[in-house]
């Protein structure tokens, strides 16, 4: 939801150019990355991916069926494909096996760790995100303590996020560096020790059921050690862990709406 219209148009252009230049017949999977408003191609694969079921549902187009027909000689023009804009936001939420494999680190890397996906579908981002969380077996809390620890590059952006959590009734607990910048910007928060700094530390608070949500964007070797300890405790006590600023923003929107205000429709009702 944070891509500009210009960026989306450029991605569409690059996709079309790559598909034509590579003489693609059937499906093609392209992974893009964006940094400092520049778009990069990570890899291109002449195959389907797990994204196909997702986009087939949100567009109401059986892409796998059409790809098979193209592969055996049909032309795209013969299939009469039409773009559908239904005015909904779709959130794809990965499902991780962390509760089954507690030794796995909850913080992500290029390595594939998810074992499935669910979709949250709504006209508003907050509602779509909340539905995706529920579908993945997680219910976002409506009150309690939010633990925040972010790296230096995220500290300016975390200010408005912490302020929003205060506004919707959460108390803030933060590590020393994050706590300092929040207090300096008029956001009341309590300081807590990192792992290895003293006791009680953040892991102790998690085990004492004193934490409702964790926002942690680690960077560096010591932070990675902390993340492992925090993540392991969070899995054990079923506490949501948010590892990006954009994820924290979406969580706030979802909590503002609340699970009781969600409405549900089948895909058949949406696309009729």
Where are the regions that the model predicts?
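Peripheral docking tails and interdomain loops at the edges
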Residues: 193-194, 202-272
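Surface-exposed amphipathic alpha-helices with a cationic face
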Residues: 161-167, 183, 231, 235
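Short glycine-rich anion-binding loops that position phosphate/pyrophosphate groups of nucleotides
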Residues: 47, 151-153, 218-222
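Glycine-rich phosphate/diphosphate-binding loops that line cofactor/substrate pockets in enzymes
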Residues: 134-146, 165, 205-211
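Short internal beta-strands
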Residues: 169-181
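ATP-dependent carboxylate activation and anion-phosphoryl transfer catalytic cores
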Residues: 1-142
